[in-house]
Amino acid sequence: MKRSNSIAVMLVLVLSSLMLLLPVEGQGHEGHGVGEILLMGKLGAPVCGVRASGRVCPDGYCCSQWGYCGTTEEYCGKGCQSQCDYNRCGKEFGGKECHDELCCSQYGWCGNSDGHCGEGCQSQCSYWRCGKDFGGRLCTEDMCCSQYGWCGLTDDHCEDGCQSQCDLPTLLPSPLRRIIAIRKLKANLANMLS
């Protein structure tokens, strides 16, 4: 009898844990269910603001309307609760430059996409750029320079038309390059959080 009770209790615990990960329409952060939010709070973005008794984010992070810390427009834009100008830059923000070598877009947001570093970029516009159109500039951190002059580790950067630093990453299979890129991003994020 004790054994069947133990199994039943264990089954209930396992099933209830799985149910926490099911998305709940209209609840949580960006369509995530409550269980996902709890997981994100533990493994991902720290909680902040009203839902966390007024706790603020680590330096450099905005507290979103949902009560999570981050650096993108989703966190620092509409509904942001505190530290909302971290990922902002440019003339409308007193000439503030972006952190971590990111480009300042024409709209005053920090990032490294073509929308940030391309036409209209306000400052630090060439960090993610490379190649013949940028004075032969090489990429940092062992990244390839794509045919279009962007630094990265994807097939688009390291294969057809790659301008420089193409050899080492192309010796690695594509999934491994993605893993390396993800690890570098995680390391950068960990450095920002510490």
Curated annotation (Swiss-Prot):
S-S bridge residues: C48-C63, C57-C69, C62-C76, C80-C84, C89-C104, C98-C110, C103-C117, C121-C125, C130-C145, C139-C151, C144-C158, C162-C166
Signal peptide: 1-26
Keywords linked to the UniProt accession: Chitin-binding, Disulfide bond, Lectin, Mitogen, Repeat, Signal
Pro-sequence residue ranges: 27-44, 171-194
PROSITE patterns named in the record: CHIT_BIND_I_1 (PS00026), CHIT_BIND_I_2 (PS50941)
Domain of life of the native organism: Eukaryota
Stored Pfam families: Chitin_bind_1
GO molecular function terms listed in the Swiss-Prot or TrEMBL record: carbohydrate binding; chitin binding
One GO term of the biological process aspect: positive regulation of mitotic nuclear division
Family matches, as SUPFAM superfamilies: Plant lectins/antimicrobial peptides
Gene3D superfamilies: Endochitinase-like
Residues of the Chitin-binding type-1 domain: 45-86, 87-127, 128-168
InterPro entries assigned: Chitin-bd_1, Chitin-binding_1_CS, Endochitinase-like_sf
Function comment: N-acetyl-D-glucosamine binding lectin. Almost no hemagglutinating activity towards human erythrocytes. Low mitogenic activity towards human peripheral blood lymphocytes.
Subunit structure: Homodimer. The homodimers are asymmetric; formed in a 'head-to-tail' fashion via hydrophobic interactions between aromatic residues of the carbohydrate-binding sites of each subunit.
Protein name (database record): Lectin-C
Organism from which the protein derives: Phytolacca americana (American pokeweed)
